[in-house]
Regions:
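Glycan-recognition and catalytic cores of secretory/periplasmic carbohydrate-active enzymes
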Residues: 2-192
Length: 192
């Protein structure tokens, strides 16, 4: 079945095109998109899960899972929930002597690595449906959603380390930056 496509209106550039109806035909870009689909997206998924031998761990998906545990405990205990608090004074937190505790690890903006990955997955799935990749993305999204608070807040740096400090340092700690990438990834995945 031939895919329905749209062409850009040469006189009305502000009319948006649905990605599902755009077909890239240029040989250079098709090759690059195929490279992203077959090599970059799988590699990045492994990197997000700290499964790339020799590469520094990102702790990204570990942080989402950890934030999900904190949120589950907060919901279960309600008003009796007391968060273990960790310092918020570092740009990057690494395990000491290889030993990890319950704190956030990685760069304080690490959440964006996942949200940019899911955005790339969305664009890839729009052009090339892949049930296995979609299943991986859906499962990862479920883990991320488990970390989200009931009020919609989602930034693992604060959810794990100290929820009382949410939105107290917008200048330095990348909360709005992370939110922007989360929004872009969510919209792309929803619209595909």
């Amino acid at each position: 079945m031939k895919k329905e496509t749209e062409k850009m209106d040469q006189k009305n550039f502000s009319k948006p095109l649905s990605l599902a109806k755009v077909q890239v035909t240029d040989a250079f870009w098709k090759k690059e998109m195929e490279l992203v689909r077959t090599e970059v997206i799988p590699y990045q998924w492994n990197a997000l899960n700290d499964n790339v031998p020799g590469a520094a761990p990102s702790f990204c998906m570990r942080n989402y899972r950890r934030a999900g545990e904190v949120e589950k405990e907060r919901k279960a205990k309600g008003d009796k929930f007391v968060q273990i608090k960790y310092p918020l004074d570092t740009f990057e937190t690494l395990p000491k002597d290889g030993k990890m505790d319950g704190r956030f690890y990685g760069f304080l903006f690490q959440d964006t690595d996942f949200t940019k990955w899911v955005e790339a997955v969305a664009y890839s799935l729009t052009q090339h449906p892949d049930p296995e990749l979609e299943k991986t993305a859906d499962e990862a999204i479920e883990a991320v959603c488990a970390a989200q608070r009931e009020d919609g807040y989602l930034d693992t740096y604060y959810l794990i380390n100290d929820q009382d400090m949410i939105f107290t340092n917008l200048k330095d700690n990348h909360e709005l930056y992370c939110f922007g990438h989360l929004t872009e990834g969510a919209v792309a995945y929803y619209q595909r």
